[in-house]
């Protein structure tokens, strides 16, 4: 029978990222998810060198990046701001691929029931 891997959002440890990865490893977890939309890990700040270092650190500790969180905190409800957030989301997708995952979690917002709504 397939055993589902268990992971954690590393920010939930409320520790520096390397310490959080070590905690996940100590708990025997398979995967980690981190935010790619805030702090030092937004793609604009998170250099290729630092990405490689963190990926290798995770691997050395026996965990993998199962997902990158691409949630900007408000969904994709505004046509005007979507111009910005869709472009930022593309950079999060690139970040996820560099961290060797193809899973990005996010919240798109509330989908209206009315299929004729502009937001639908």
Predicted features and spans:
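Acidic (Asp/Glu)-rich catalytic clusters
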Residues: 1, 21-28, 45-67, 90-100
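Hydrophobic faces of well-ordered beta-strands that scaffold small-molecule active sites
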Residues: 4-10, 32-34, 65-70, 104-106
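Short polar catalytic/cofactor-binding loops
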Residues: 10-17
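Glycine-rich, proline-tolerant flexible connector loops at the mouths of alpha/beta enzymes
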Residues: 33-59, 108-115
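Active-site acidic/histidine proton-transfer and metal-coordination neighborhood
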Residues: 16, 22, 59-61, 75-120
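Glycine-/proline-rich flexible loop or hinge segments
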Residues: 35-40, 69-77
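Short, contiguous strand/loop micro-motifs
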Residues: 6-8, 40-42, 78-80, 117-118
């Amino acid at each position: 029978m397939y055993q589902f891997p268990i992971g954690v959002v590393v920010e939930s440890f409320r520790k520096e990222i390397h310490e959080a990865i070590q905690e996940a490893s100590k708990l025997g977890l398979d995967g980690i998810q981190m935010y790619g939309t805030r702090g030092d890990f937004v793609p604009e700040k998170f250099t290729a060198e630092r990405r490689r270092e963190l990926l290798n650190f995770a691997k050395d500790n026996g965990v993998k990046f199962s997902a990158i969180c691409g949630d900007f905190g408000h969904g994709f409800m505004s046509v005007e701001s979507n111009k910005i957030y869709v472009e930022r989301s593309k950079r999060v997708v690139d970040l996820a691929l560099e961290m060797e995952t193809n899973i990005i979690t996010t919240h798109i917002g509330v989908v209206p029931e009315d299929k004729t709504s502009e937001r639908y």
